[in-house]
């Protein structure tokens, strides 16, 4: 995996928080950039997992393998809004493809489709989103608060989201790989 240059800041890129982003929701975050334009940007944090006591009250899991449905904190904005990231090509007409085989949006109706079998689709239900005003993300990027990496379905829907930050940095290689080993609490070093 190679680091993407700043000019490739675009939909489908991963924003990887620098270790300098210390504290708060963006500390060690990996954000999937879902939209980027001169007017602003928005993305979803992928690796801040939420434990939900009764997920069936939020989303019908009847036809899904629960191990393939994850809940996460998408960002600090509108935390009561749910954004759906998924791999279901069945809902491609009502969704936006963010990167190959990863879709954003659509309604939950595809959950009831193909009754009688367990679906293999993977899903992230993200509470809230992350947003930047025009020029803000570029400024943060130039200040070294974010690194840019390519995304893939495998990274987005990893079975180990708690390791996503360090795994992506490891794959970037070089100095990024060494950054992945910095402990979260430097006092424990």
Swiss-Prot record:
SUPFAM superfamilies: VC0467-like. It comes from the Bacteria. Pfam families: DUF179. InterPro entries: AlgH-like (IPR003774). GO terms for cellular component: cytosol. Belongs to the UPF0301 (AlgH) family. This is UPF0301 protein CTL0463.
């Amino acid at each position: 995996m190679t680091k993407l240059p700043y000019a490739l800041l675009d939909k489908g890129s991963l924003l990887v928080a620098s270790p300098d982003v210390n504290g708060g929701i963006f500390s060690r975050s990996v954000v999937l950039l879902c939209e980027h334009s001169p007017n602003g940007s928005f993305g979803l944090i992928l690796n801040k997992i939420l434990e939900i006591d009764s997920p069936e009250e939020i989303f019908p899991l009847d036809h899904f393998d629960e191990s393939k449905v994850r809940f996460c904190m998408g960002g600090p904005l509108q935390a009561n809004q749910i954004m759906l990231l998924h791999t279901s090509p069945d809902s491609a007409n009502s969704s936006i493809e963010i990167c190959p085989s990863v879709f954003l949006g659509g309604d939950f109706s595809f959950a009831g489709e193909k009754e009688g079998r367990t679906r293999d689709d993977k899903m992230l239900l993200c509470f809230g989103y992350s947003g930047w005003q025009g020029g803000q993300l570029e400024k943060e990027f130039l200040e070294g608060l974010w690194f840019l990496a390519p995304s893939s379905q495998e990274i987005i829907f990893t079975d180990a989201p708690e390791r996503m930050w360090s795994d992506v940095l490891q794959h970037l290689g070089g100095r990024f790989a060494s950054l992945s080993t910095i402990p979260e609490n430097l006092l424990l070093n």
